[in-house]
Amino acid sequence: MKHLSAYKQWHAETVSRGEEVMAQSRVAICCMVRDCRSAFEKNLKFIDELRTCFNESKLVIVENDSTDGTKELVQSLEDHDGGIYVDTFDTGEETLLKKMKSGVNPSFSYHRVEKMANYRNRYLRVLNEDIGLDAIDWVIMLDPDVVKFSLDGIKHSFGQSSCWDVVHANGRSKRGLFDDVY
């Protein structure tokens, strides 16, 4: 039990240190959205709370081809908050190919990975050209249709920010943990 108590103390101190780092920092939070209005609306509360943890914050949203009201939602967000930047466009492309001739899961196909990389380059353009890289200290990329985020987890990461340049979330695929999907 002594070790557990020491761990809890270390964890609390690290979260507190993260809060201090965040409160002195400028952040850009980047999201890509398509046909996820319901989940995105739920996560906007978290994103708003996360933004308040920083001295300054920007929210960059890249939206494409939504037909469920997501496009209209993100456009209204930009209209009401000068710290929100929206890049919305239509490609007419399918989200995922139905089936690959090679048998590869379409979620991990070259087609989808290339498309997602191009979309991510769009928010990098917004960061570089519209916001300015000198105006931010950190970039957080969030998948806004994830079921739940941990604010303490993010604070904990910032509490150790002297040890890292990049932090990546641990996700789970439908195929199980530690399954090589590529």
Language-model regions: role of each:
Residues 28, 33, 42-51, 58-60, ...:
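Preference for well-ordered, secondary-structure-rich cores of eukaryotic proteins
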Residues 42, 46, 73, 118, ...:
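Alpha-helical elements of Rossmann-like donor-binding domains used by nucleotide-donor carbohydrate transfer enzymes
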Residues 55-65, 87-91:
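Short beta-strand/loop segment that forms part of the nucleotide-sugar
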Residues 139:
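Short aromatic/hydrophobic "clamp" motif used to bind/position activated sugar donors
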Residues 1-49:
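N-proximal low-complexity "stem/linker" segments adjacent to membrane-targeting elements
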Residues 69, 73-136:
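Active-site-proximal specificity loops/subdomain of glycosyltransferases
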Residues 35-43, 77, 144, 158-162:
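Catalytic phosphate/metal-binding cores of nucleic-acid and nucleotide-processing enzymes, i.e., regions
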Residues 146-182:
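Conserved catalytic core of nucleotide-sugar-dependent glycosyltransferases
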